[in-house]
Regions:
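Periplasmic c-type cytochrome electron-transfer domains
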Residues: 5-472
Length: 472
């Protein structure tokens, strides 16, 4: 067992645990959503919140058009809008059939090497992300009609590739002989449009995470996260979380990473938002002003853009609106948070050592710009640190200082509402886990001994622990 975790009693229950987002918490009734305004958002900010939400929803279109406020899509891209991937503010959905194209989730790529600024060395022809959509009319007809044999014309900008998922299967057997079917995705990349990939290309399939509570995560003091870091495992608990060091594209310097599945983005939601616009939608902006085309994609580079007078497809003020929409999304309140079974599961969660990475609570810092998010007691259940999760979950693709087997601990708040929010039950970085139980069973590396504690619980105890996680 992990040293000290099997005898770690849960702390005294706090009434604040019913409100994971503090005063920002919102009801999940009658309809669950991860895109509602924070419960304490001042009325004066509601118009901007809804304007930002509309911008996040709006589908961008090919330039040039008369709708100049939202033209400039692509020319190659993965999604037409922010919330196309983050459906209702939640996770994107993985394709279940091997004949269904990957749309929403995406594949990051790079080649071996280090780059202080980008964090990875992009593949020379295709960059650091495979764009599976394009503004080509033939491609659009192919998508709408599902006529997969429609051919793109020679003069049209082609999507970089089409991607499908072949699910691999295995069975996990508990000591009590209970069996669980597990699966993992194997991307199948077809119709590479611009030549062969570098033979050393590394691939990482990514499922889009939920976006609620990000403004609160942004306000967690870095010192509180640093206090949880233990890169050399000096305390001997078997867990050695560490902080990634990444490039801040606004400050032009290296800073602590916080956002992204490998904590590969700085603690600045404006940068996170701008990167998604540029890489996923193909929309140039003040932070990432380049089109998503590489040097060899000449037709892509020559395609008309939607740049305004400032040379950007989304200007600074509109980028800020979308960023503030993300910052001000409320966190759902918990239900049945103090029921007998949930409290029993809470005790088992701590006894098993889950809290060593899924750190329960923080208090946000003071912010004159965001006073309603300041000094909030929050319960996200994450330490926002990198942890080695073992070979089964490794993508083999380093990012800044994160290794190919390290991932940032994802927050657990709202995980039990995933089905109600948008029907997506795709957990973990690549959407392989369909249940909380499956997600736990995929844990390895630093979490292996904690997983073994869970595995060796009685079946009824395992269900109690899962019920607690689902209650978050």
């Amino acid at each position: 067992m992990v040293s000290g975790c099997s005898n770690s009693a849960a702390p005294t229950l706090s009434p604040s645990e019913s409100l994971p987002g503090g005063e920002t918490s919102v009801s999940s009734q009658p309809f669950a959503s991860f895109q509602l305004p924070a419960g304490n958002l001042p009325q004066a900010l509601h118009p901007d919140f809804h304007a930002g939400k509309a911008l996040a929803h709006q589908p961008w279109v090919r330039a040039p058009t008369i709708t100049t406020a939202r033209d400039g899509l692509g020319p190659i891209y993965n999604a037409r809008s922010c919330l196309f991937c983050h459906i209702n503010g939640g996770r994107s959905q993985m394709p279940e059939s091997p004949d269904q194209e990957l749309i929403g989730p995406f594949v990051r790529i790079s080649i071996p090497g280090k780059d202080k600024i980008q964090g990875v060395v992009p593949e020379p022809i295709y960059g650091d992300q495979l764009q599976t959509q394009s503004v080509a009319l033939s491609h659009q007809l192919r998508q709408v009609s599902q006529l997969k044999k429609v051919s793109l014309k020679a003069e049209e900008v082609k999507p970089e590739a089409y991607i499908y998922i072949d699910w691999q299967q295995s069975t996990f057997t508990y000591p009590d002989q209970t069996q669980v079917n597990l699966r993992w995705p194997k991307p199948r990349i077809t119709k590479l449009a611009y030549g062969e990939l570098n033979p050393d290309t590394m691939f990482s399939l990514r499922n889009s995470p939920p976006i609620h509570g990000t403004g609160l995560l942004e306000l967690i003091p870095q010192s509180a996260i640093d206090d949880l870091a233990d890169p050399q495992d000096d305390n001997g608990d078997g867990v050695s979380g560490r902080v990634n060091q990444v490039w801040d594209f606004e400050q032009a310097r290296t800073v602590a990473g916080r956002f992204g599945l490998k904590a590969n983005r700085a603690n600045n939601l404006r940068i996170v938002t701008a990167a998604a616009f540029a890489g996923d939608v193909g929309i140039t902006n003040p932070i990432f002003p380049q089109q998503p085309c590489t040097e060899v994609q000449t037709r892509c580079l020559k395609t008309a853009n939607g740049n305004g007078e400032d040379g950007m497809e989304i200007p600074s003020n509109l980028l800020s609106l979308v960023t503030d929409f993300l910052r001000n999304i409320g966190v759902p309140k918990r239900s049945n948070w103090n029921s007998e079974s949930v409290l029993a599961g809470r005790e088992l969660f701590h006894q098993s050592g889950c809290q060593l990475c899924h750190h329960p609570d923080f208090t946000t810092a003071e912010s004159s710009q965001l006073p309603h998010l300041s000094r909030q007691k929050i319960w996200p259940y994450t330490d926002l640190l990198l942890h080695d999760m073992g070979p089964a979950l490794a993508d083999g693709r380093p990012d800044y200082q994160a290794s190919g087997s390290e991932w940032r601990t994802p927050p657990l708040w709202g995980v039990g509402l995933r089905e109600a929010v948008n029907g997506s039950n795709n957990l973990l970085h690549d959407g392989r886990a369909r249940t909380v139980e499956e997600a736990i069973l995929w844990h390895g590396g630093e979490a292996e001994q904690v997983k073994q504690h869970f595995v060796n619980l009685k079946s009824a105890q395992r269900q109690l622990l899962i019920e607690f996680v689902e209650s978050l």
